[in-house]
A protein has these predicted regions:
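The feature captures the beta-strand-to-loop junction immediately N-terminal to the Walker
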Residues: 38-40
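Helix-to-loop junction immediately C-terminal to a conserved catalytic motif
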Residues: 53
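Conserved ABC transporter NBD signature motif
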Residues: 61-73
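Short helical segment in ABC ATPase nucleotide-binding domains corresponding to the A-loop/adjacent helical element
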Residues: 93-101, 111, 115
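Conserved ABC ATPase signature
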Residues: 130-134, 138
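A short, proline-enriched helix->beta-strand linker immediately N-terminal to the Walker B motif
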Residues: 149-153
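Catalytic Walker B motif of ABC-type/P-loop ATPase nucleotide-binding domains
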Residues: 155-158
Length: 252
């Protein structure tokens, strides 16, 4: 197992007092898997992702990556947040190099890898452009390449498509899914979009209302060889959707 979350519990202080965010959460992932976390709004999805990233401190329990306990931010873990967080005054190549520079890994070898990633994923001709000259989808691809450049063992994605319009969102999620499959990258996605989770994931972890627990796990490995768009047309897509929706127990 590349990720093991063992009985993770976490509380935090709010203006209204102590809030129990996570209650005895346990889950695991195999290397190369793409999994998603879904749950009701405000249930603690991003809090759990932050704990795995080493940005939140557990009250009890543990999180292991490659058998080593997570005690803070680690170069083994890459995080792609909701916004692309590109610096508008830097070129695309400079933006992609930032993570490596922060880690003091700006070497000829790392620069060659960045050049290869930009070429492989269609951004080489934009390397000297500014982020404002790119489409929303290309900006997200740039943000992904920046994260992949540090060669993380695990990639955490915190609703990275939420700022995109629907059509762009479909195209970019399919694009990023293909890149991660090609790279053999282990990835964990937080999303509020059930369809997005089904179209991209090998498994879905369904969280309960706060305090969050793992209420159910939906196995989608029968769809593993299909692209996100092909999955949306698959006969079982709506079966999976209805099953996840039922587990979420959302009343409208």
């Amino acid at each position: 197992m590349i990720i093991q979350v063992r009985s993770a519990a976490l509380t935090y202080q709010s203006a209204d007092g102590e809030v129990e965010a996570l209650r005895s959460i346990s889950l695991s992932m195999n290397e190369g898997e793409f999994c998603s976390i879904v749950g009701p709004s405000g249930c603690g999805k991003s809090t759990l992702l932050g704990a795995i990233a080493g940005l939140e401190t557990l009250d009890s329990g543990s999180i292991l990556v490659d058998g080593e306990e997570v005690r803070g931010p680690s170069p083994r873990i890459g995080l792609m947040p909701q916004r692309d967080q590109l610096f508008e005054w830097k070129t695309i190549q400079e933006n992609v190099m930032l993570g490596l520079q922060v880690r003091r890994r700006d070497t000829p070898e790392s620069r060659r890898r960045v050049a290869e990633l930009l070429e492989r994923y269609g951004l080489a001709e934009f390397a000297q452009k500014r982020p404002g000259q790119l489409s929303g989808g290309m900006r997200q691809r740039c943000a992904l390449i920046r994260t992949l450049a540090i060669e993380p063992r695990i990639l955490l994605l915190d609703e990275p498509f939420s700022a995109l319009d629907y059509q762009t969102r479909l195209a970019v999620s399919a694009d990023i899914h293909a890149i991660l499959r090609r790279e053999g990258q282990t990835a964990l996605l937080v999303t509020h979009d059930i369809s997005e989770a089904i179209s991209m994931s090998d498994r879905i972890f369904i969280l309960s209302r706060r305090p969050a627990t793992v209420k159910a796990v939906r196995d989608l490995r029968e769809l593993k060889d299909l692209t996100p768009l092909q999955r949306r047309d698959h006969p079982s897509f709506h079966i999976h959707f209805n099953a996840v929706w039922k587990e979420l127990d959302i009343h409208v």
